[in-house]
Regions:
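Divalent metal-dependent phosphate-bond-processing catalytic cores, especially two-metal-ion Mg2+/Mn2+ enzymes
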Residues: 1-16, 26, 66, 83-212
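Inter-helical turn/loop segments and adjacent helix faces that build the functional surface
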Residues: 2-10, 36-41, 61-72
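His-Asp-centered metal-binding catalytic motifs of divalent-metal-dependent phosphohydrolases/nucleases
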Residues: 16-39, 54, 76-84
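Short acidic alpha-helical/loop segments enriched in Asp/Glu that coordinate divalent cations
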Residues: 35-37, 70-73, 117-124
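Alpha-helix capping and helix-loop boundary segments enriched in small/acidic/polar residues
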Residues: 42-49
C-alpha cells in the first residue's frame, strides 16, 4: 500500500520490498540456539538480546542469497522490531530505508496483537518465556530480584496498558501511523486494527469479570 500512495521518487521499490520481507521472516532468528551451544537450554533465554543476535545472523545469511549489499541496512532496521536499541540511535543514510524499518516494526507488532490467540499466548506461552529470559523476574543493580510479572494472569492484567502504549508510542508515534498503508488493500478498512480493538475490548471485559 505504501508505494501505491507515493510519487515514484519516494517509492521503496522491489529491492527494498525484498529486504523488508527477508528481515521480517528472520527478525526473530536470534532466539535460535547454535548447535554447539551447551550453556543455554532454551532459546527464550536470549529474550533480552535476540534482536542483536538476529542482526548477526543476517550478517552471515544475506550474502548467501545475493543480498550482501543490504547487510548494513538490514542489521540496523531489524532493531525497529525490538527494545535493545533506542530508535533514535538507529543509523540509516536513506529515508527510504528508515521507512522500511518503520513498516517492519509496524508489521511485527500488528501481527502479534491482531492474532486471534494473542491473549492466550501471552498467558500460556509468553509468560514462561519471560521467566526463562529474565524479564518476568529481573535482577536489579543491587542484585535483588524484582517481580515484574508474577504469573501468566498478572501478565494479562498488564497487557491492556502494553497494547495501548504500543499503539500510541510505536504505531502512531515512532512509526507515524504506517499501519494505514494497508487500508488501500482493504477498501479503506484495517482488519488488523479491528482485530486488535476487539481483543483489547474482550480482555478488558475478562479482567472486569475475572472470568478466566
Amino acid at each position: 500500500g505504501y508505494d501505491r500512495t507515493h510519487a515514484p521518487e519516494l517509492r521503496l521499490g522491489a529491492e527494498r520490498a525484498l529486504l523488508g520481507l527477508v528481515v521480517a521472516l528472520f527478525h526473530d532468528a536470534g532466539y535460535i540456539r547454535q548447535t554447539d551451544d551447551t550453556q543455554h537450554r532454551n532459546g527464550a533465554e536470549f529474550t533480552r538480546t535476540h534482536v542483536s543476535r538476529g542482526a548477526r545472523f543476517l550478517e552471515r545469511y544475506m550474502p548467501t542469497i545475493g543480498l550482501a549489499n543490504w547487510v548494513p541496512v538490514a542489521t540496523q532496521i531489524i532493531h525497529f522490531t525490538g527494545y535493545e536499541v533506542p530508535f533514535g540511535d538507529i543509523r540509516l543514510d536513506d529515508a527510504r530505508d528508515r521507512r522500511v524499518g518503520h513498516l517492519l516494526g509496524t508489521a511485527d507488532m500488528m501481527a502479534q496483537m491482531s492474532d486471534r490467540c494473542y491473549l492466550e499466548k501471552c498467558r500460556d506461552r509468553l509468560y514462561p518465556e519471560f521467566v526463562l529470559g529474565g524479564v518476568a523476574l529481573p535482577v536489579g543493580a543491587n542484585g535483588d530480584r524484582a517481580v515484574k510479572y508474577a504469573s501468566g494472569l498478572d501478565l494479562l492484567r498488564q497487557t491492556p496498558q502494553f497494547m495501548e502504549d504500543t499503539i500510541q508510542k510505536r504505531l502512531d508515534g515512532a512509526f507515524h501511523g504506517d499501519y494505514r498503508y494497508v487500508e488501500p488493500l482493504f477498501d479503506g478498512r484495517n482488519p488488523y486494527i479491528e482485530a486488535i480493538d476487539k481483543s483489547l475490548s474482550f480482555l478488558r471485559q475478562v479482567l472486569r469479570s475475572e472470568s478466566w
